[in-house]
């Protein structure tokens, strides 16, 4: 191997650590044999990508270079397979890319499940130098993160369940207290008004969605909080619970605005604008507070970090991938 290739070593390793797949792609394109480079601890680039959770570099190696089959049997000085490495807790800088302990644990589980697909069946229970299987390593390394994730999930569910319970109380009371009173026949006085129809539909919609959201949040509080629950089950419940909370809040404010319009705006039409403005205020507050969390949950749960992403289409090695087959 030439001196020029060795000059790429530090750049390649640093690019893997930083998950800068463009640099890795450029180096591999110009010098394919650099794929065999190792750092001072003896880890090659796929091992480093797994240890440091560099998903873009991992995807580049896996889907473009077609190199991964030869990595299945690689072990480090402690007899750790690549699945053992995936079971280790990610470095703090990698964990901090994701907000919230529960989502961090979800990302760790996604990595473990991804590498599990890559290894051979017998490697799932293969033991390292310390007589530990990959599953045992994962559980041991993530005990603290699991506790933090449980606290984070419960705290989030509790705060949201309080809001949902308040909405249920308010809209239920509004449903049995008909604005304007009833006729002798028992029918509402305003039943012919469009605003009353909007109120009735919005209030009922708010009641149903807030009650559904409350049940979802309660199901989180009573969950077992096993490792697998953090992968899909708990995040999915929180996603749908937050969606129900957004919808119920919006519907409640629409119902409240419709009643104000019904009562005041026949003779004071100028009040319509301030009513709409103030009705939007609580909606904007809850959106500002909770939408970033909802977006993070949806991206983490439904948008996989592994696979052939669009950014790989422009990689130079994509047009040169056959040269790596014999390495």
Language-model segments: residues:
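Transmembrane alpha-helices of multi-pass eukaryotic membrane proteins
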Residues: 10, 43-44, 154-164, 194-208, ...
């Amino acid at each position: 191997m030439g001196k020029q290739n060795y000059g790429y070593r530090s750049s390649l390793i640093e690019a893997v650590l930083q998950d800068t797949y463009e640099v890795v792609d450029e180096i591999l394109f110009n010098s394919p044999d650099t794929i065999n480079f190792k750092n001072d601890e003896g880890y090659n680039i796929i091992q480093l990508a797994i240890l440091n959770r560099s998903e873009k570099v991992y995807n580049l190696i896996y889907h473009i270079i077609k190199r991964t089959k030869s990595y299945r049997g690689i072990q480090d000085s402690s007899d750790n397979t690549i699945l053992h490495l995936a079971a280790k807790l990610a470095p703090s800088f990698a964990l901090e890319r994701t907000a919230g302990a529960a989502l961090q644990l979800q990302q760790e589980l996604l990595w473990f499940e991804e590498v599990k697909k890559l290894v051979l069946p017998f490697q799932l229970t293969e033991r390292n130098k310390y007589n530990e299987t990959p599953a045992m390593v994962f559980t041991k390394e993530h005990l603290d993160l699991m506790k933090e994730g449980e606290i984070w999930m419960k705290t989030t569910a509790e705060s949201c369940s309080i809001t949902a319970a308040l909405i249920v109380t308010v809209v239920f009371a509004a449903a049995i207290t008909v604005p304007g009173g009833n006729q002798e026949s028992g029918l509402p006085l305003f039943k012919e008004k469009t605003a009353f129809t909007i109120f009735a539909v919005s209030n009922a919609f708010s009641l149903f969605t807030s009650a559904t959201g409350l049940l979802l949040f309660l199901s989180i509080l009573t969950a077992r909080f096993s490792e697998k629950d953090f992968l899909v089950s708990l995040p999915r419940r929180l996603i749908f619970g937050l969606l129900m909370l957004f919808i119920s809040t919006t519907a409640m404010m629409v119902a409240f605005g419709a009643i104000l319009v019904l009562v005041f705006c026949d003779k004071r039409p100028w009040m319509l604008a301030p009513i709409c403005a103030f009705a939007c205020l609580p909606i904007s507050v809850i959106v500002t507070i909770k939408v970033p969390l909802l977006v993070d949950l949806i991206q983490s749960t439904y948008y996989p970090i592994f696979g052939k992403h669009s950014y790989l289409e422009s990689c130079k090695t994509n047009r040169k991938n056959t040269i790596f087959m014999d390495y």
